[in-house]
Amino acid sequence: MAEKRNIFLIGPMGAGKSTIGRQLAQMLGMEFIDSDAVIEERAGADIDWIFDLEGETGFRKREERIINELTQNQGVVLSTGGGSVLSKENRNVLSARGIVIYLETTVDKQFERTQRDKKRPLLQTENPRETLEALAKVRNPLYEEIADITLQTDEQSAKLVATHIIELIDNLQ
């Protein structure tokens, strides 16, 4: 990669965005930023608390401001929250300011990776698998809409996915 363009990772919860993002940033010598972590740091509270207090709408407004700010940086690998693509504004800034990588995963793998994670407010339901299926139905077309590259992450290590991303980005330029 001659120039260090921004790389934005999108996809559902449990796709590996944060893990792969850290690996990718390390391999490229770039800064890694997790938008959810920045939201929590700025709010002084975790996401489930923000959801409880402000609802999903309040959280999404925070997320929109943070993503707009973070995408103005140069040479970063940014991992976004699974629902960030619900905002047209987020989709626009992600598309305009970097290379968008959609990390795709099956609902089965998502469920396996997230079932013990209590920090996922949208999964604190009677039937989390059904919730994941409903989210996928709405969000997957939005991920596909803005993705420059799509990669399946189900049975691959973070290092292997990061290596594939680097190869594919090199081919884009």
From Swiss-Prot:
Reactions catalysed, as given in the entry: shikimate + ATP = 3-phosphoshikimate + ADP + H(+)
Transmembrane parts of this sequence: none
Cited Gene3D superfamilies: P-loop containing nucleotide triphosphate hydrolases (3.40.50.300)
UniProt organism field: Actinobacillus pleuropneumoniae serotype 5b (strain L20)
Protein name: Shikimate kinase
GO cellular component: cytosol
Annotated localization: Cytoplasm
Recorded family membership: Belongs to the shikimate kinase family.
This protein's record includes keyword Transmembrane: no
Cofactor note: Binds 1 Mg(2+) ion per subunit.
SUPFAM superfamilies (UniProt xref): P-loop containing nucleoside triphosphate hydrolases (SSF52540)
